[in-house]
A protein has these predicted regions:
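Beta-strand-rich structural segments
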Residues: 432-446
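Conserved, well-ordered active-site substructure
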Residues: 118-147, 151, 155, 294-366, ...
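Low-complexity "stalk/linker" and mucin-like segments enriched in Ser/Thr/Pro/Ala/Gly
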Residues: 458-474
Length: 480
């Protein structure tokens, strides 16, 4: 069976031409913006490629637009190797987490800044890939923030996005039948009078509380009770496992936790006995609003707020330099998510400073936006079309610490249930021929065929005719 597309070519080619080429101001400079690619690639998701031409430079830009109201699309972060340390390419993260018929990670970008070298406190375990600041994936806190200049993108389980104007506030608690104590962080270095919670994602699966002062730290293991799961903002009942110890760099049990502290925190930990029940709560708040985020990544600076470019370049030294950049943001109604990469350090694309990146995000439809890790990390991946941008390391993807992904939760289906154009809209002159590129999609809107052949096109005879091959239009009509 052949599928048919009826081409209202005069309407499509003329109206879409205004969409394909416009003028847009990028930090006081006018650029001609040409759409070089635009197509649906998955449930509620399109990918768009742009060429911006200015007075003395060009820029290549690639972005995803995701309809968060689509029932078959989800947004998820991945911490590389599913551990606090470890690096993978964006492609590797997507492929390793995809489960056919359950969750296909069909598009994504790199995430926040991460350690590119170094070892843990033991001096031997690598920390390469460890996020510099907060990271949450599948509701699990991999790390909390350690810097006031961090800004965060988070999204809830019901797909409501948030972007902080300041560092996400984190103050957890551990409560016994008679007492409670503040938890100051997760998987970060301990401090005097503070309790830190360590998870089994730690490098070496130990607390890494070592060094000259480590004999002063008290530690004890905890395990969630049956049916309990520790996620941001939801109290979790746990049981103390074993006796507390001092200065042991304690091993963290699979699926469990260890709390560590010294000074005033020491007596609290010493009061815990094997079998005691405790409750742990780890709330996070964005600009004062407590949010139960399911996924979170970190960047800086925040570049767009309420649709306005923010004067935040002073927050990081390289913000005023031209580099490849990655950004994430969302529309004013929070129903559209934008994930964007601008290439840089190439002959065809200079790269941008963060104020320019903000204007690119405005063009793409964002009202709020955050600068993520860029440079050689900048990557925009799709499962069917590959990496869409040109990573600055000669096109080779860098292994990074985390990524943000668009996930199809639709059932698996390899049957082509619909077709659509994948050729950038443009104008053709009378007498010219035009053969559009056509993509095939399953019933859930997932791109499954980029080489469709079993289709024919038709058109109104007043604008031209279709050749015998059924796929080539000739513009020889008088118009509508």
């Amino acid at each position: 069976m052949k599928l048919k597309i009826y081409l209202w070519l005069v309407l499509w080619l003329t109206v879409c031409n205004s969409y394909a080429s416009v003028t847009w101001k990028v930090w006081n400079t006018d650029y001609r913006v040409d759409t070089t690619f635009h197509a649906k690639i998955g449930p509620g998701t399109t990918q768009t490629s742009l060429l911006l031409t200015g007075p003395d430079t060009t820029l290549t830009v690639f972005y995803l637009t995701v309809d968060l109201t689509d029932p078959y699309v989800d947004i998820r972060t991945v911490c590389a190797t599913d551990h606090l340390a470890g690096a993978q390419t964006v492609t590797q993260m997507a492929e390793s987490h995809s489960v056919e018929g359950e969750s296909l990670y069909f598009a994504g970008i790199n995430g926040g800044f991460f350690a590119m070298s170094g070892t843990a406190n033991d001096g031997k375990t690598s920390i390469v890939g460890r996020p510099h600041h907060a990271s949450v994936a599948e509701g699990e806190i991999y790390r909390t923030s350690t810097s006031a200049i961090c800004r965060h993108f988070g999204i809830t389980s019901d797909k409501v996005p948030y972007l902080s104007s300041a560092s996400v506030d984190f103050t957890g608690t551990i409560t016994t039948a008679t007492d409670s104590y503040e938890i100051s962080g997760v998987n970060v270095n301990a401090g005097n009078n503070k309790i830190i919670l360590y998870t089994d994602k730690m490098p070496g699966q130990v607390t890494q509380v070592t060094g000259s002062s480590f004999p002063m730290y008290y530690e004890v293991a905890l395990m969630p009770k049956a049916g309990e799961r520790l996620v941001p903002g939801k109290p979790c009942k746990m049981t103390v496992k074993g006796a507390w110890a001092r200065g042991t760099n304690m091993a963290i049990p699979d699926g469990g936790y260890v709390i560590s502290g010294k000074g005033l925190a020491g007596p609290f930990i010493q009061s815990l006995n094997d079998g005691d029940e405790v409750e742990v709560n780890l709330p996070m708040s964005f600009d004062g609003e407590t949010v139960m985020v399911e996924h979170l990544t970190t960047g800086n600076p925040k570049i767009l707020g309420n649709g306005e470019v923010l004067n935040t370049e002073g927050e990081r030294a390289d913000a005023i330099e031209w580099h490849p950049r990655t950004s994430i943001g969302y529309s004013k109604d929070k129903k559209k998510l934008i994930m964007l990469v601008c290439d840089g350090r190439t002959e065809i694309s200079r790269g941008v400073r963060t104020r320019e990146l903000a204007d690119l995000m405005r063009y793409a439809g964002a009202d709020e936006a955050l600068n993520l890790d860029g440079g050689g990390s900048s990557t925009l991946y799709t499962s069917m079309l590959g990496v869409r941008n040109y990573p600055s390391s000669k096109g080779v993807q860098r292994k990074v610490g985390d990524g943000v992904f668009v996930v199809s939760t639709a059932p698996a289906s390899s049957f082509v249930g619909g077709i659509d154009f994948a050729t950038p809209p443009h104008v053709i002159s009378k007498g010219e021929e035009y053969s559009p590129t056509v993509y095939g999609y399953n019933a859930y809107g997932l791109l499954i065929n980029t080489e469709m052949s079993n289709y024919t096109i038709t058109c109104d005879e007043r604008i031209g005719y279709v050749k015998a091959d059924g796929k080539t239009f000739v513009a020889d009509g008088i118009g509508l």
